[in-house]
């Protein structure tokens, strides 16, 4: 497969693979080391979803039709047609969730039988997450907002109106996808949601609202707030949120060219709220649609040209004067906030207390500018953390794949160590255990 327009990029559930959908087929890559492991020339793929590193893949080739393929056998397992366009697909070993604008269809993966149809508020940005865990198999999405004029009759020539209207608040409904029941509603934000993510075992939920300034993390299924972070003060749209495999870090990308990494410390304040048992394992939001119509509240320069090889864009290292000054100012603000918040009610104190990022990275600017030297559209990005090293992986809507090192002791700015392109013309495949 060569060329084609990039439509969609997503990590698999444990970030070991990357799936790329284009106008001329799709590809799978290993993320570490970066290498292509599968390629197909079939169709115009607008959405793609892998099932871990198995040969099972879900594809959207036309807006209303989903196709489940076994890539190892080159066979189609089933085809499903829906009443409106498919906006997102979520998959684990037991459940398949297909997200439409006003409905979610839930299937049993073992036989592909429909087990539940869930009506939702209008959800054009497909805000939804499914835990990769087969045990705590939670599906989370914006809480439906019922219509107030339920008794009003629509004109006979019009279709009946939806029973729900767009949400006015950022409440998250937690649904048990195995037992098919609602288990909780998390009141996460006062304004509507922009992004949500679950960790691997379904014990943590990360949320961001449309303003994009505050990130919150809750326990599941209890819904108790564990952490609250400030991403920044300028409103922005959150593109991607991702837990690392030990659920000790949370990565967030947005319309800003900065990726923030927040540390999930088990402080005394949060000790009683943390889920019981061992450390959780991580997942996402881990994909983006290049043609996503969601509004952008800021403009982001495009990322690098994505040539294969190691990056040379070492920015300010963690021990630099700039980072020392940045950390010193944050410590001063936290000190003042700590004193002030001790005299304030909890609801007011929370405005002072949100932690800032532990580390951050800057996405490189692209040399592939449009006419006039400016990008035609803001660059979208999705982030994940390596399971084998302290590295952050960033993939961008211009096909760039970037790997950054993070200092796990000092934090600060990470530096670029590798960069590749998922749109190059090299069709050589590497040997791997993909699909085994």
UniProtKB/Swiss-Prot annotation:
Protein task: The PI(3,5)P2 regulatory complex regulates both the synthesis and turnover of phosphatidylinositol 3,5-bisphosphate (PtdIns(3,5)P2). Necessary for proper vacuole morphology. Plays an important role in osmotically-induced vacuole fragmentation. Required for cytoplasm to vacuole transport (Cvt) vesicle formation, pexophagy and starvation-induced autophagy. Involved in correct apg-7/atg9 trafficking to the pre-autophagosomal structure. Might also be involved in premeiotic DNA replication.
Free-text domain note: The N-terminus might form a beta-propeller domain involved in specific binding to phosphatidylinositol 3,5-bisphosphate (PIP2), leading to the association of the protein to the membrane.
GO process terms (BP): autophagy of mitochondrion; glycophagy; nucleophagy; pexophagy; protein localization to phagophore assembly site; protein transport
Region of interest (Disordered), residue spans: 272-323
Family assignment from sequence similarity: Belongs to the WD repeat PROPPIN family.
Protein name: Autophagy-related protein 18
Gene3D superfamilies: YVTN repeat-like/Quinoprotein amine dehydrogenase (2.130.10.10)
PANTHER family assigned: WD-REPEAT PROTEIN INTERACTING WITH PHOSPHOINOSIDES WIPI -RELATED
Superkingdom assignment: Eukaryota
GO CC terms of this entry: cytosol; endosome membrane; fungal-type vacuole membrane; phagophore assembly site membrane
Short sequence motif named L/FRRG motif, residue ranges: 229-233
């Amino acid at each position: 497969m060569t060329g084609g327009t990039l439509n969609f990029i997503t990590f698999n559930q444990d970030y070991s693979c990357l799936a790329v959908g284009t106008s001329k087929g799709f590809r799978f890559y290993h993320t570490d080391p970066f290498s292509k492991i599968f390629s197909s020339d079939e169709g115009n793929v607008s959405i793609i979803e892998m099932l871990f590193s198995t040969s099972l893949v879900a594809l959207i080739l036309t807006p209303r039709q989903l196709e489940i393929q076994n890539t190892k056998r080159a066979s189609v397992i089933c085809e499903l047609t829906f009443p409106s366009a498919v906006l997102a697909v979520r998959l684990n070993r037991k459940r398949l969730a297909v997200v439409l604008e006003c409905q979610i269809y839930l299937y049993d993966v073992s036989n592909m039988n429909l087990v539940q149809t869930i009506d939702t508020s209008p959800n054009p940005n497909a805000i939804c997450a499914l835990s990769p865990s087969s045990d705590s198999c939670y599906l989370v999405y914006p809480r439906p907002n019922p219509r107030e004029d339920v008794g009003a009759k629509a004109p006979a020539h019009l279709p009946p109106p939806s029973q729900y209207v767009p949400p006015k608040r950022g409440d998250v409904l937690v649904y048990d996808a195995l037992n098919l029941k609602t288990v909780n509603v998390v009141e996460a934000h006062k304004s509507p949601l922009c992004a949500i993510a679950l960790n691997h075992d379904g014990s943590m939920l990360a949320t961001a609202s449309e303003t994009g300034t505050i990130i919150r993390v809750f326990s599941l299924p209890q819904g108790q707030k564990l952490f609250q972070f400030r991403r920044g003060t300028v409103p922005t749209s959150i593109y991607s949120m991702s837990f690392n495999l030990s659920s000790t870090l949370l990565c967030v990308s947005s319309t800003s060219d900065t990726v923030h990494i927040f540390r999930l410390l088990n402080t005394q304040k949060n000790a009683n709220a943390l889920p019981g048992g061992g450390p959780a394992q991580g997942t996402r939001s881990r994909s983006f649609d290049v043609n996503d119509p969601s509004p952008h509240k800021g403009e982001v320069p495009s990322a690098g040209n994505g040539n294969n090889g190691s990056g040379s864009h070492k920015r300010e290292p963690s021990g630099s004067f700039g980072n020392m000054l940045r950390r010193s100012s944050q410590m001063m603000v936290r000190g003042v906030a700590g004193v002030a918040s001790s005299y304030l009610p909890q609801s007011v104190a929370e405005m002072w207390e949100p932690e800032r990022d532990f580390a951050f990275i800057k996405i490189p600017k692209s040399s592939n500018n449009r006419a006039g030297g400016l990008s035609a559209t803001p660059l979208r990005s999705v982030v994940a953390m390596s399971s084998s090293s302290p590295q952050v992986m960033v993939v961008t809507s211009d096909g760039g794949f970037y790997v950054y090192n993070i200092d796990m002791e000092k934090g600060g700015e990470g530096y670029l160590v590798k960069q590749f392109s998922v749109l190059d013309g090299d069709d050589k495949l590497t040997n791997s255990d993909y699909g085994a």
